[in-house]
Amino acid sequence: RKGNILLACLDESFVYNRKSCLFHQLFGLWTKEWIYLGSTISGQEEIYIFIDEVQLIEEWEKSVNSYSQDYTEEYELFISGSSSRMLSGELATLLSGRYVQFPVYPFSYQEYTEIRHLEQNRESYMGYMNTGGIPELFVLPEKQEVQRNYLSALKDTILLKDIIQRYSIRDPRLLEDLFAFLVGNASNLVSIGNIVNYFKSQGRKTGYDAVAAYIGYIEDSFLAYRCERFDLRGKEILSGTAKYYINDLAFKNFLYPGTAYGVGYKLENLVYLELLRAGYDVYTGCAKEKEVDFIAWKGDRTIYLQSTYMLVYEQTVRREYASLEAIQDNYEKLVVSLDDFCLPSHEGIRHVRAWELHGLL
């Protein structure tokens, strides 16, 4: 019940004290006879404590470890933050075997249709693709200017608080331009060297180390994901080039609509995110000089996937299927598209309509 839940959002402007003692003060709230809204807590009931942006508390790892070992109190502790490094280093060592991690993503297509009360079909999938899954978009007025202003503020907040302030960025303009570059080139193979050369061609002075570090920070803040390239013949990850996918297509749709980015690239981005949500480790692959959009592993399951806008033309069918036919094993092979119809299976390769992919994962 509501009285048994304590939620603390530490990124709020009124939270001035972020010393380690703040942790003890938060836990002290529910040991009193009152809690938020005056609800009382029975000693027999379990308490749920949610602390958002916990990394803002000094030495928070030690505090979390301390309370996770307190078996005299009945509570469940949930911590969240906007950095992929939260569960690396000291915290992972301190809490080894005593935590469960839940990656959180923007709304999926299934959640989108549920909220909008829509049937799952091509029309609603295109609507999701052209809107995105950022939760706030579902409560804002459906006016592009309002939505664009919100997403611009969200992007600026993430870049400022999660990256610029945290890592003392010297060139904030380069950071923002790199994010715009990743949005505009999502689903394409790129390398740090390519990116450096691009900026130099635009008259920007920058170096390999700075670009690599800034892109790493963008990844750490979950604004974009790096998808490594895997050689199916050599069974190894290839260094150099990789693909990047953005956290949500809303950033593309509302902030950078002018960049060259077709429906096929958007679909590939959505398929990648769907695989992540389903818990797969995802790579982009190559086999016998042919590219495979995705190699996905989860446990003992392996799936190869190609994504393409439409399979209307025979040459498109041959191209997409040829990459999968070149793989000489018996693992699942899927071609995902936005066609209204489904092609019959061919050489063990199954055609899937994009809005039905979730049910197969």
Please provide the spans of the model-predicted regions:
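Short glycine-rich substrate-engagement loop in P-loop NTPases that contacts/grips substrate
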Residues: 8-45
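Domain-level recognition of nuclease-like catalytic cores that cleave nucleotide substrates
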Residues: 340-361
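Accessory nucleic acid-recognition modules appended to NTPase machines
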Residues: 144-302
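Conserved catalytic/switch belt of AAA+ P-loop NTPases
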Residues: 61-79
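Structural recognition of the conserved hydrophobic beta-strand(s) that form the central parallel beta-sheet
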Residues: 50, 76-82, 103
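Conserved P-loop NTPase "ATPase switch" module shared by AAA+ and STAND
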Residues: 42-60
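Active-site ExK catalytic segment of metal-dependent nucleases
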Residues: 302-312
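Interdomain motor-coupling "hinge/lid" segment immediately C-terminal to the ATP-binding subdomain
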Residues: 82-84, 88-189
